[in-house]
Amino acid sequence: MNSDKAFVSKIRKKVLISNDFREILITQNTSIIEQRIIMMVLSAIKEQQSLFINVKAFNGKREIQLSFNDYYEGWANQGLVEFSIPLNQINPKQMMKNSAIQEALIQMTNLNWLRLKDETINGFKAVPFILEPSWNSKYIYFKLDKAIMKNLLNMNHYFSLLKDLPNKTSVSNTLRFLLWILKFKKIKQVTKEYGQILKELNIPSNKYEGSYRFDRDFLKRVKVDL
């Protein structure tokens, strides 16, 4: 791992998440450890994300937004981006076993971890979130594909999140539910049928024995965290 070129996670109060990636995480079953790793990635690239935010100039006109191809021109012949994350940022209270963190890294290399739009076939392709994970007693290292970075840097529509949220939640569904409900934040009240909620969260219809069990096993646990 070339540390001079690697993105390093930073201590921040908030991170930015693109709407594209938010939509992916809503339908993805991620563990709390995976969510912490994702937050570390977002903390490392926040300056890069700001380059893609469409800013309104003083004259009322919107400044020309940087394109991803222009940004990536400086990374010629490099299809992968390196990341370096201190273990004590993922496991600050040292309550997790290192083996659990390593298992989460391996899980995130799964080809089916997420699906991205593939314009070349007018469809989707399954891709891992990270590649080539490695670790020692102080750091974890991995790489992100250019296609993943493009998804994370698409700031046409984005949201702000507390970076330490996965450190404070007791269940992994809390972040998932929060990301889902973010799109309704400008609406005072939202009414959804039980089946529609399951569909939007990509939860199998037979996962719970009716809305009562969903409320008991999913919503009530999320409410405790929020």
Language-model segments: residues:
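Charged, alpha-helix-forming regions
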Residues: 1-225
